[in-house]
Every structure is written in structure tokens, then in C-alpha cells.
Amino acid sequence: MPISFEIYRDGQRVTQFTPVNPVALGPESVPIPGEIVFENGHLSIVRTDEHALGIALLWDLGPQGCYHLETTRLQPRPTPYNLNVELARSRLMKIIQKQEDWNLFDFPRADQFAAMFRDAQNLFSDALGKLHEPVEAAALADRSLAIAVDLSEQLANFHGELLLNRRRASGSIPKHVFGCRVDSTVQNQRYKDTLAEHFDYAVLPMSWKQVQPEEETFVTDPVDEWIEHLTRKRIPIVAGPLIDFSDGGMPDWSFIWEHDFDTLRELAYEFVQKMVHRYRKAVSVWNVVSAMHTSYHFTLTYEQIIELTRLLVSQVKTLLPAAKTLVTITQPFGEYHARGHTSMPPMFYADMVAQAGVNFDAFGLEVAIGVPTSGSYARDLFQLSCMLDKFSTTGRPVFLTAVAVPDRNQPDSNDRSEGKLNPSDAGRWHRPWDPQLQAEWMEAIYRLALSKPFVESVAWADLADINPSIPGSGLLDDMLKPKPSFKKLQELREQFHRKR
């Protein structure tokens, strides 16, 4: 029996609907495989079992934004649920949970939020009383959800500022906080000087695909030049990821060994050994593996994923016992896991690695929001704060190694997708993306991230709009002129260094 929903918009039941990025959810909001279809006026989750499931999809809230929202888990039943009501129910439940987690129920200055919550709760109660009149119930639920999303963002910001002030007062914010990932193929001197003069450290990619495009060919000149420049300027370097299992991250020739784990393991081991030996005197932190949990093109078992992670991290530690090592999580919302391949949910992988005796020092974390790819649909600040909180139980610090949002609401022919990614298809944070909104989002997420005691640093994903990872995500434009986001980042850096 499927779990189905009726959808209401503008006072009418929707009879034609194309869900955007719909995902079935299991326990702990973990995405799981499941067919989601809209037919005969119902949005349905179809699976062979009859477990309780939730659904997440892009949902437009009008002036507040358009976010990837979720329902609670619901039991299969013959009659459909009201999707509007279930989305409101889920957000109100999460607010209660996080208020408890954040100890805000009895916090004196949190009283200002109680009235908003009562309003949202009362509207939701009214909606439950009108379930026999679904159009009216949906309208009440929509109003409740709008208040709840606004309230939850305010709560996330309020809690973040509380923790950030405590962290700054205690002097526990590290010295090297503000970094930026560079494109080593860019050898422009102004580009290099901007990085060296305006950031605490550099994230220097040196992936297997980039350095060894052919099995017997090593191309290290671009990386060598960057290493020399950064070393001369005394800029700390986070190198890697060395082995990147994300989509497009592995060398094309490596797919020959897709079903030969032993050979793949040996080749990866040799590559890591060469890179660490070559740059051992220059690199401060080694980002050893990334996206291992997504298993995009390699059908690895859970045991093989953990074994390869352990082997490669141990290799770095054997060569450089004092080196700091990262294991990087990408797509932290885990939507890739709904594909049904041999992937691992992000936090399951994080917990497994942390508990399996892998001798690594910290997690790396990549967060890209605002493009229509798996894991990058728009989320509000409350959702991002909740995601970060999950890492608090791993017992490891977190380095945000690549954070990005677009500065435009249309495709960018110069980005790595060559114009295939359109931010307008991925939702919006309050309003359509523009350069000023990019700067506002940056300030909000940096303050939120650095309020978490376990977050040690944050690096922006793209220095300039020269082959950026997503449309217009650079801090400089393609002529290397500063954008509002660059200026905002320098203001933040000055504030933190002055008051640290």
C-alpha cells in the first residue's frame, strides 16, 4: 500500500504537479530508495514494504523562499494525507526538538519567540480540526508553515549568536579560520596575490584525476607552482582531496578497475604515497579522501569503503606521523543514497569511520547550496544548523573545506557545468540569488558555522568566477574584481581577528 498525499495551492486541489527533487525518507530523515509518482491527483511513495516513510521535495513558500522541505514519517493507509498539513507538522516538531537540544525553552531572552510559536501552533491545531475540509486545512497549514520557517531561522540565528559570543569570549576560535579553495590551473599573479593577502590559509586541490589524467602520466607543474607561491608567502595549505569519489572526481582510466577492488586500492595507495612524499614539507593538512560514502561509479561494499578510508589515512600517518588528516563528507543531506546503489548515508559513514579505528584528525565538509544537483537544493538556515549539529556527536572537529552559493538566478556558461546548472530551478533563500544576497548568505552561514564549538575553519569554494564550481560562486568576478561577498568576508575576517 503506497503512502499518498493530496496537494493544495491557492485554494484549490492540484491535479497536475511535477515534484522537484522528491526523496523518500526513512528514520532520522535518511533518504532511501523509493519511487515517487504523481498520478490521479495523488503524490505517492511506492515501495515493496509497508514501513512508515516521509517525503522531501522543493516547496515554494512565496516571499520567504523556496526550500527542500520534508514531512514526518507516516504510516501507509488507504486515504491520502494532506501534504500541506504534513509539511507544517514536521517543521513544528523539529522546532520543539531543537529548542530542547539548544536549551532555549527556559532561556530568558528566548521569550520573544514563544508568541510566534503559539501562533504557528494554533494555526496548525485549527488545520487539524479542518481535515474534513482539506482546502481550508491546507490554507491554515500554509500560514502555520510560513510562520514556523521564519521562526526556525530566527531561532537558529539566535542560538548561533549565543554560542558565537561564548566562543569568542573564551578565546577558543582558532587562528586560521578563513580560507579559500583555489583553482591550481589558474596561474594569474593577481589571483595568487589576492589569495595570499586576504585569507588565513588556502585549500589546494590535487586530485587523482587532475594530477594523473593518464595511468602513466603525472601533471604536477600547476600544483608545484602554487605550492612554491604559497610556501614563499607563508600561507598554510590544506591539500586535497587526494582521492575524490564524487561525480567526476576519479580519473577516467580508473574505471577499468571498477570491479577489481584490490587493484583500485593498490593504485590509490601508490598515488597518495607519491603526493604526500612530494609535498610533505609544504602541506599543513592533508584532505585524504572525499565523497567515499557516495560511491558514484564504484560498487564498493560498506567494508571496502571503510577499509579504503582506513588504508589511505594510515598511509599519510605512516609517512608523516605528525600530519593532520581529513576525511571529507560531501552532500551532507544524503540525497544520493536514494539512488539505491552501494552508497552509505553521510552520518552513517561518519560514525563508522569515527568508531572503526581510522586514525584521522577531523572531518572535512563541503556545502554547496542553490543549484539543482543532488544535495544542493535550497535549504534555510535552520536546516543547515541542524545538519551541522549532527557532527557534534562524532568526537572530531570539522573543517568546512568548500562552501558555495551562486550570485545569480540563471546559468553561467563559464562554470564547470558549462551552463547546465540553473539556480532558479533549485529554490531560493528569501529571494532569487544576486550578488548582494550571496554576501548576506555568506555572513549568515559563516557566523552559524563558527558558533559550533567543533567547527575549526571555513573555506569558500571559489576565489573567482573562472571555472567556478557553481554559477557565479566566486568572490571575485571573471575580471578579478571584488564582489560584495569578498568585501563581506574581509569584514568578517577583520572582526574575528580583532576580537579573537
Regions found by a protein language model. Give the residues of each.
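A eukaryotic intrinsically disordered, low-complexity regulatory tract that is acidic and Ser/Pro-rich
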Residues: 170-174, 179-185, 189, 193-194, ...
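Aromatic-lined carbohydrate-recognition surfaces of secreted/lumenal glycan-active proteins
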Residues: 174-182, 288, 309-344, 396-409, ...
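Aromatic- and acid-rich polysaccharide-binding/catalytic face
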Residues: 196-214, 279-290, 294, 323-333, ...
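Substrate-binding cleft and catalytic face of glycoside hydrolase catalytic domains
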Residues: 197, 201-213, 224-334, 410
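Aromatic-rich peripheral "rim/lid" segments of glycoside hydrolase catalytic domains that contact
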Residues: 278, 287, 292-311, 315, ...
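Short, acidic/polar
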Residues: 183-196, 265-275, 340-353, 439-448
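Long, charged/polar, soluble alpha-helical segments
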Residues: 1-194
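Alpha-helix N-cap and loop-to-helix initiation/capping positions
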Residues: 136, 140, 215-222, 256-267, ...
